[in-house]
A protein has these predicted regions:
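Catalytic His-Asp segment of secreted/periplasmic serine-dependent ester chemistry enzymes
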Residues: 188, 250, 287-368, 372
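C-terminal outer-membrane/trafficking sorting elements
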Residues: 380-462
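Serine-esterase "nucleophile elbow" of acetyl-processing enzymes
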Residues: 141-214, 229-237
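Active-site segments of SGNH/GDSL-like serine hydrolases
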Residues: 244-248, 268-301
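Oxyanion-hole/transition-state-stabilizing segment in secreted/luminal serine hydrolases
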Residues: 187, 196-197, 222-262, 271, ...
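Disordered, acidic Ser/Thr/Pro-rich linker "stalks" and the adjacent N-terminal cap
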Residues: 26-72, 81-91, 97-102, 112-117, ...
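Trp- and acidic/polar-enriched beta-sheet ligand-binding modules for extracellular glycan
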Residues: 35, 59, 87-168
Length: 462
């Protein structure tokens, strides 16, 4: 099962989240410091390795890749995403055959005096050996340094993205999206309007989530447990596991594997907590019975709800009810998210479910009490479905019209790069605004916020 391609306009998932969030789940930001920087690959440079998108045909097999993130961070978390067939690992399940070459054997070097990524003095900050997974993060010391460089041995495969985050303050905004083929095909779609991380950043500008995609087609909870040591080895250094799991356990509509599923999920939860990882579990995605011939047994949904309640976990997205109401976002098999908005909806639903954590974290950092944090989370986490404005591009000018102005308060329209940099922010007094300064070719998001309403539109400048 491979990645889907989606080229869409704006979409906003509406709803109300009323989760009581306390400071126990407070998130410490880790600033993205590599977004949009040129990646030096010998005699050439490229920007698609740092543009925030996993475009399949824009990959690199260079054996040396260097980035200058500048001085300042004392520690860096360096994430990378490889293509493969979009599965996180190739041999964790017997149900599907997966292929792809992971970035397996390489060193990460750092320099304080390089000028172009090749000259200067370099030190080994990390050595990675026999890595089998397509997405991973490594923490390195970076005090006094300005450059880091991947130096690979052997086949590099297809490298899609490199991200570096400043971990000087002990950032905990780190995420691993464990899942089945639904996440493999949805969360790792080669192009969607915006990722969960981008949506969170657009709404909470102090945060730039470090996001690893871990979907594997055909995997079930029993196979996850069988490979928990590998999950913890290669994705155990993040703070949050965003888990989509259960479709293959519940396949066919019966409940014959329910007991095993509950036992396995509890094992996953316990193992994550033992490593100080907070698991957040999505409700299993509904099928389209007219095409699949079956539906998720309600007993599995009740089991997910009970696991969340009994373990006092933050609530994950309700994939079941959303896709039950939107079967048009499922593919021809009636099970998997399609390329015409299915993966896009998954990103939005995850962002909506996680918003209370960020709202509570913002409130706690501003000095509010625990009660205030909960109240703020309930208030900020309301997403009202609104029509996206009309966006047009003429050369390097972006016009935004048909903006729904707030009856009270300020309507804020922001132009944000795909990797989270705010280019310009305008307080709109009419339903039309224009962005014309510092606009280069690339992918952008137009974000409108007002009176609890929120929309995101994607735009490309050629």
């Amino acid at each position: 099962m491979g990645c889907f391609s989606y080229r869409g306009a704006a979409a906003v998932v509406g709803g109300v989240v009323a989760l009581a969030v306390t400071s126990a789940f407070a998130i410490t930001p880790n600033k993205l410091v590599s977004g949009g920087l040129p990646a030096h690959t010998g005699s050439t440079t490229t920007d698609y390795l740092t543009d925030g998108y996993l475009t399949n045909w824009k990959s690199s097999n260079a054996k040396e890749i260097a980035l200058n993130v500048g001085e300042g961070p004392k520690k860096l978390l360096i994430n990378w995403e490889s293509y493969g067939d979009c599965a996180w690992a190739t041999d964790f399940t017997s149900g599907c055959g997966h292929t792809g070459v992971a970035l397996s054997n390489f060193k990460i070097l750092t320099s304080a005096n390089s000028t172009d990524g090749t000259d200067g003095d370099w030190e080994v900050a990390a050595t990675i050996e026999n890595n089998p997974v397509m997405a991973r993060g490594v923490l390195i010391d970076f005090a006094g340094k300005s450059w880091f460089k991947f130096v690979s041995e052997g086949d590099v495969g297809k490298l899609l993205e490199i991200e570096a985050f400043d971990m000087t303050d002990g950032g905990t905004d780190t995420w691993f999206f464990m899942g089945t083929s639904l996440s493999q095909m949805g969360i790792k779609q080669q192009e969607t309007d915006s990722t969960t991380a981008q949506l969170i950043h657009a709404r909470f500008p102090n945060y730039t989530p470090a996001m690893l995609r871990g979907g594997i087609g055909c995997i079930n909870s029993t196979e996850v447990v069988a490979h928990l040591d590998e999950y913890l080895k290669y994705a155990g250094n993040v703070k949050y596991w965003a888990i989509e799991m259960g479709t293959n356990d519940a396949w066919g509509g019966g409940d014959w594997d329910l007991d095993a599923y509950v036992k396995n999920m509890q094992t996953i939860i316990d193992s994550a907590k033992a490593r100080n990882i907070t698991p957040i579990i999505a409700r299993i995605m509904a099928t389209n019975p007219e095409k699949s011939g079956w539906q998720i047994n309600p007993a599995f949904l009740e089991a997910v709800d009970k696991l969340v309640e009994d373990n006092k976990l933050p609530k994950g997205p309700d994939f079941y009810n959303y896709f039950l109401e939107h079967p048009e976002l499922l593919g021809n098999d009636g099970v998997h998210p399609n390329a015409d908005g299915g993966g896009q909806a998954m990103h939005h639903l995850w962002a909506e479910a996680l918003a209370p954590l960020y709202a509570a974290s913002d409130s706690s950092k501003s000095g509010g009490s625990k009660q205030d944090s909960t109240t703020t989370a309930r208030k900020v986490a309301r997403w009202t479905k609104v029509a996206a404005p009309r966006v047009s591009v003429r050369g390097k000018i972006i016009d935004v019209s048909d903006i729904a102005l707030a009856n009270r308060g300020v309507t804020e329209v922001s132009l944000v790069t795909a990797i989270g940099t705010v280019v310009e922010k305008i307080h709109a007094s009419s339903n039309t605004v224009r962005f014309s300064s510092n606009i280069n070719a690339g992918h952008y998001l137009v974000v409108v916020r007002n009176a609890g309403r929120y929309s995101v539109s994607k735009v490309v400048v050629r």
